[in-house]
Amino acid sequence: MGKQEKDLGTAWEYQGCLIPKDLYYDIENQVWVRVNEDGTVTLGLTDVGQTRAGRLLHIRVKPVGTKVKKGKPVATLESGKWAGPVPALVEGEIVEVNPKVVEDPNYINIDPYGDAWIVKIKPTSEETLKRDLSELAHGEKAHEEMKKHIDEWDIVCMRCV
């Protein structure tokens, strides 16, 4: 059976996995960031990440006001088959924690790119933000790297309800 791929306009879909075009990705850790109009960035787990983890049962998130370094955990997720950190993709300060995912981590399995974001971070400076974003996959590069990752792990994305 051939691989399933579609261009949905604002996102690509490959093997059932959504890859929104406007996001920056850490492919290895399967975490994304979106740059917001107010200068903050929103961070969450990718569709591939939530599929690999399985139904998420627990989340521990660093509190608002915590200063984070790129690569250091902003949260820890746990499912029945996996537990691991969610790294910050930019240096800055946590300015908001999503109460929906704290109350029900499984929400990430349902809507990983929408209302199920994990934290919002105010970057330390424009310079550090530019530096940090330049080290992430974006656009066509993200699309190709994500497809390679999906193929290597033989993933077909599903959203757990």
From Swiss-Prot:
Keyword Amino-acid biosynthesis listed: no
UniProt cross-references to PROSITE patterns, sorted A to Z: BIOTINYL_LIPOYL, LIPOYL
Keyword vocabulary terms for this entry: Lipoyl
N6-lipoyllysine modifications at: 81
One GO-annotated biological process of the protein: glycine decarboxylation via glycine cleavage system
UniProt remark on cofactor binding: Binds 1 lipoyl cofactor covalently.
Listed Pfam families: GCV_H (PF01597)
Ranges in a coiled coil: none
GO cellular component assignments: cytosol; glycine cleavage complex
Cofactor needs: (R)-lipoate
Family of this protein: Belongs to the GcvH family.
Protein function: The glycine cleavage system catalyzes the degradation of glycine. The H protein shuttles the methylamine group of glycine from the P protein to the T protein.
Protein name, per record: Glycine cleavage system H protein 3
Biological source species: Aquifex aeolicus (strain VF5)
